[in-house]
Amino acid sequence: MTAESTRKASIERSTKETSIAVSVDLDGVGKFDITTGVGFFDHMLEQLSRHSLIDMRVMAKGDLHIDDHHTVEDTGIALGQAVAKALGERRGIVRYASLDLAMDDTLTGAAVDVSGRAFLVWNVNFTTAKIGTFDTELVREFFQAFAMNAGITLHINNHYGANNHHIAESTFKAVARVLRAALETDPRQKDAIPSTKGSLKG
């Protein structure tokens, strides 16, 4: 993580179901150290870090003998909380971003407003219940938890795609790229809060 950055935060979250430690640097270079015990999910979080340029450390232990649900959802909660904490008052950020991201057969769009208001719009359909052993419905569960706890409005729309792995991965990459753009410091407004209300606390 960069020595100059002040937009860093760490969160530790423990329940009877999971124990999770997350650290982020919003002004990083996309370095990651991620272990959740869920291989496909680790791969997706690595994409989120690498393409957002947010340095991430995620260590999660959960009740995987039951299923992956609690680990994935609670990681989304902790990661969202860490991003919100690192943002602070959200001064000087670009705030908005949107794009369409292509991945082979798949095209997925993402749009974000780092507004302090939590909302998820999800228009993504998978044609299989699992990718390997990973439940595809957990992709939405992660982004729901992340958006609610980061305090962001997030829209994700898969336009088309035949390969379910590509559909899932394109959602993480698309979200990563809009986060990269929206969380950047805007040199034209520096420490100003990008809102006529004077606050981005929801």
Curated annotation (Swiss-Prot):
GO cellular component: cytoplasm
Swiss-Prot/TrEMBL keywords: Amino-acid biosynthesis, Cytoplasm, Histidine biosynthesis, Lyase
Catalyzed reaction equations: D-erythro-1-(imidazol-4-yl)glycerol 3-phosphate = 3-(imidazol-4-yl)-2-oxopropyl phosphate + H2O
Domain of life according to the entry: Bacteria
BP-aspect Gene Ontology terms: L-histidine biosynthetic process
EC nos: 4.2.1.19
Pathway connected to this protein: Amino-acid biosynthesis; L-histidine biosynthesis; L-histidine from 5-phospho-alpha-D-ribose 1-diphosphate: step 6/9
Stored PROSITE patterns: IGP_DEHYDRATASE_1, IGP_DEHYDRATASE_2
Enzymatic class: lyase
Record has Cytoplasm as a keyword: yes
Location in the cell: Cytoplasm
Recorded GO MF terms: imidazoleglycerol-phosphate dehydratase activity
HAMAP family, per the entry: HisB
Similarity comment text for this entry: Belongs to the imidazoleglycerol-phosphate dehydratase family.
Stated name of the protein: Imidazoleglycerol-phosphate dehydratase
